[in-house]
Amino acid sequence: MSADIVKQLKGTRSDVKAAATTIELKFKEFSKGIGINDASFPLRYELSVLRQLCLALKDNLHQHADLYCGIAATMLPHVEPYEEKPSLWEAHLTSLRYIHHGLCQEKSLTECQKMYGLIRSQPCRLQEEADYKFYLDIHLTHFNGIYLQMQKETLPLAATDELYYALEAMGVLFDTMHQRKVAKNAALLVQLNDSLFSKRSKAFLKYLSALPPESTTKMYDPLLKLLSCSWATPSSELTNQFTEYLGLVLALVQIDMFSIEAPLEQQLALKLLRICRDLYKDVSPQNYSIQLLYYYVKLMYVREATADFKQTYIDLCKKFVYFFEHKGATHAKEQWFMDLLVFFQRLQTLLHQSSNKPPLDIFWQQLEGDDSSEVYTAHFQLLHGCLGLAVNVVRSPLGTSCSNEACKSIRRHCLLYFGMCALEAYINWQPTTEQKADKAPYKPLLGILGYTLDVAKSMKCLGPSAMELVKLVRLLALVAEKVSCPEQMSLVLAFLEPLQHLRPLIASQDMLSVLRRIYKASVHCKSSDMANRLQSTYLAALTNPSRLRSQLFAHYHNANNTEKCVYEWHESSPMPNPLTPAQTKQLYDVDLLAVLHFLSAPPVPLLQSLLRCRHNDYHLALLARKMRTDSEVVRQCEELRSQLHSTALKQPLSRMQQLAIGHTSISVLLEALEAQKTKFSIKETAENCLEELIVKNNLLELNIKREHRLVELATSAIAGFAAFFERADTEPLGCDDTPIDWEALIDDAVAAAMALSTMGYMAQADEAWLLILRIGQMLDERFTYLRALTHFLGQDHLNSNQQLQLSEEVDRAQELLDDLWPQLQNGWFFKRQHTIVMLCLCHMASYYARQDCLCHAQLLLLQAEELRAQFDERVGKSDIVQITIQTVRFRLEYLRNKRCSSLPRRPTPLRQLDTLVDSVRNYCTVSSVDLGALQLLLADLVRESTECAANRLTERFAFYGTMLNLVLQSGMALRTIEVLISWLWMNLQMEYLDQAQSKLRLLDHLLAIKPLSRTLVEQTSATYVPAIAAKEDLKANAMSELTSNMLLMQLVEPIRKQNQMDVATIKSLPMHEPIPTSHQLQRYVSKQGTPPHLRDSMQLQCIYFIVGCLHARFSFLKRENDQLDDFYVGAGNWLQEDPVRTATLGSMLLVHELYHLNYLRFRKKHKEALSYAEAGLKSVYQTADINYSFNFMVQLKTARLELHPVGKARAKTIRRALAFNTSPEDKRRKGVVEGSIKAKSSARKTPRFKIYTELELRPPIGCSNSSSSSSKSGNENTPPSDHVDLNACQAIEISDDDAASVSASTPAPSQLKRSQSVPAKATKTRSARVGSQLKVPEIIELDDTMEETPSTSTAATVKRYPTTDARSSRARNRQLEETPATTRGRPRRKVPEPAPQQETVSLRPRQRN
């Protein structure tokens, strides 16, 4: 070839065209025989041109590729092999291959297809055996190039024909090789495996299997035909080709499986295994293994169910195991054996990956059934045998290559895949219940599993994104999910520890999936401890607090073993989570709150477990709330509290420390309250045995000093909560801070407030409830807010120091109530919440009543009643709501100064008190807040009922015993003092001086002034002999009994209940002991005399002052007046010292003023009494009992009469009136006489009393003319008197209960006529008629008006009242044993002729002051 052509081929396009024209002309000449020196000249010329084309393609970068293809097309038909020089043809094929490879690129695909078509159009000429390599290389390159471009979608779908052409061309090549008997199959297999079969990816083989069988068959059949002809291949070469055959079989198996149109129909792998069986028939080790593989693949390819399939497979697995056991020791290090193991591993991988989908699903279906346990046992044994021999695998071309450069071990990958195959087989197995209990399949499986995980730990290529590890974790999760019996659970327990070593390599989500399935499978653990450990592992792995909380709730709901908390179980778990410190703390915090909130009564071991694992002091405070019966926990709380208080002296406490102080203080407080409780019957709280009760029940330690510690604990808790609350929003919570349990804070704050309220310390209780109100408002805790507000609504006077606008809070509460009360019936609320809403309505009614909104108050009470009637559990029962409604109505009635015409008339206050007594007696608890509310309500009722009854001169002792029983059993000193003060007030009103003396001793004991034990010692050492009671003669005793019985039969009140305006000296009855010097009255009003433990509390100062007022009244009634002047002067100074303290006395200040007025009148200081009475009348506040105003007015008018008497008339002996309740006035009342005569005539058959007008007794020695005789006025040697006047009548009290019935038949006060006392003559006429029958008592209703008249007072009318009404008169309810001790067993006091009396006014007997 000339140099011009060479230059032209590398030149421009026109130059290339010129060269192409020259070459074309040249080959035309060759075809005509011109210029041919020999037969090889055209071939040599063509080679020279092809060489230049190769160089030109390289230099011009395919710029003229189309022209080059045209030049090649011109030359190829004119060349053929030259037999004498085979190298020329080899060079020709090499040049064509180079040009085709150069054109097989994306930018020259058209020229490539043109060039390949040109090569394919020429006959396949194999001059030498090695020439097939060039053709095969061209076909494979073209096939792979077109496939690659089609994957990139750079060619149209029609380009698929090029693939068909390539496959057909390879089939032609294989036929040519078979015809030429080319026996070099080793190189052919290597080239085919590298480019088309075993070394290609799974995706490529899937694509290849998807090609039409018409094209692929034209390649597969010639290839298998070529491979079947060994042409006497030596055994050594066959041994070397063993790996390539296995690789080709593996690829054909995949092609058979992936075939779309007819999977497993071609059975290419089986055909190749038959060929290999024949090829290796003389190579014994390989021959047997190929036979086993042939039958194994044949079973895989089965398309129909056969009867003996299971047994066949079991026998085949046993033969494999036998072969591996006997040949493994000999050939384990040989390459073919290692290749065989790797091939079998890949075959098993293909088999198990298609277990649940065609075409191998039939194979797995036939393994199920009755004998599936034996089949799977054989299968697991086969895999276990392969796994044991695979440890000898060093290298194999069949092994999968790892993408990680650090991993070069095929052995580890082989072992890992064997283990995953076993896990997949186990997951696909569906055993029956009986088969699950068979342990035979689990034994080889456990070995496989353990070895696989051990190998996985040592692999360097495994990571969170490694496909092998992801698949292994997924399989382990499915194994755990499959667990349904303890035998299956043994597999899970086997991989726990190895899996823990792999945990750093596993993605968090994948690991969480495994742990979740282990969590569910743990229910089948034989050991409950292990089950709890496994469950705690999954729970600890949850980092979302909400999800963790819900899962913990479910765990503790279904847990069979609650000896430890989840946090502690996790610490001993075989798979502990690698938690950060923040996650560890979060786990404990959520675990703690779940136990405290979800379990109403957590088991003690569970709480102790949480206590052992606590992280800070706040955890101890929360746990102590549930372990208040544990003395050790309470001791720890006390130590923590002391430690924090010590720290507070050195540095400010953090808010969490303040919160811990609050909770620990409550724990210590409640334990102390519980420890001081005792039990005794309510019958033991009788009035005459209170001191014995204190001694008998070991209550000598009960006093105000001991209770001071409890108050300190409660106030310390509230102070801690308040300090925390003030800083709650100012400082954000850090990651190390424990979430605040606001529910626990509210509960403990309410417990402190309830303790203070129940103990009676109202100032401290107000602060506690105000804090709770603010917390409830901030947290939108509606029921907490309403409960706190209810405390303030029930108070008559709010503390001025409190920053509380009650009117604004009431408006806010009304909005809440309007939203809440319609929803209470929906069942979304607890019973205690129902109670809170209804109690708030009741106390809000009380609030509006104090604001003079009576109609609004009544409407609120009606709403509460209607709301209560909607709950079936309250209907027909006396619950706290009903008692509260009755109490509020009682307050509305007896504290109302004027009646509203628009409101219905209610029963009288005393009758309402009787109703309240019945309701309390029949009390029924409905919710958890009822008992506390009842105790607070009873404390108010004791005070209010005492005030109401005392101002009406009647006795209402029903609440005293109940309340005293409650407070004494609870060990509450201040509440006991309040009850005893009320009782003492009533005793003094009724002049029960013995009982009053006992109350004073008890009060001194409770106030820690003089212990009762010392009093009892002094009382025991003293010798008290009642003179009169021990020396009274029989006649005097009979007379005393007779007069007492007469009074009882006549239903007459004792003389001390009469409102006598003459204040002559009344000598008291003898007391059991004199008042010692330590009981000086001055100590009650002097700052120095007040005990130190009472000086710091305004409430206790007021209590002490009230006791002093009552003590002064007691001294006055005993006529021990030496200290009273100094006391009342000191009391006035005490009251002026602190107006706020004075205001807290309430109605007891009015009582004190009335007592003071009475004393001033007794001392004839009428002017001073008048000024005090006028001031007192003005000081009565609007909401006070109306009787206070009446009492001040009575004292005022009486003092005026005593200051300016109208005239003095000679007072006659008071005679016993035949009509009862007559006033002992100077002038006789004619109306009474006429009324009594008329009544006698209208009831002729009525038995009458026998009145003794005279008694032949000698006058006593030393008898004085005082208005009342002392019990020491006589002795046993007193001679009988010649005359005893028993005509003095004792007035019968008219109770409020009788007012309505009496007023019906009684004329108006203006129509009443004056009457005179019954003359003695009329009395004497009746003295002879004392028969066995008694006259029906006649009740006289007194006028309420007050007149000043010189000689007469308001008349009284006589009215008969039936004796069958048991509730109409309090006198009828009084039993014999209720008669005051001062009137029993004691001679009747003699009434000598009095001096002329001053003119007095007739008043109601209940206005006694």
From Swiss-Prot:
Keywords: Cell cycle, Cell division, Cytoplasm, Developmental protein, Mitosis. Residues 1260-1284, 1297-1409 are annotated as: Disordered. Its main location: cytoplasm. It comes from the Eukaryota. Residues 1052-1058 are annotated as: Separase cleavage-site. GO terms for biological process: cell division; Malpighian tubule morphogenesis; mitotic sister chromatid segregation. GO terms for cellular component: cytoplasm. Disulfide bonds: none annotated. Residues 1264-1273, 1300-1310 have a biased composition (Low complexity). The keyword Cell division applies. It is found in: Cytoplasm. Required specifically for chromosome disjunction during all mitoses; maternally provided protein is sufficient until mitosis 14 then zygotic protein is required. Involved in formation and/or maintenance of epithelial structures: bud extension during Malpighian tubule development, and foregut and hindgut morphogenesis. Interacts with pim and Sse. Cleavage of thr contributes to inactivation of Sse. This is Protein three rows. It comes from Drosophila pseudoobscura pseudoobscura (Fruit fly).
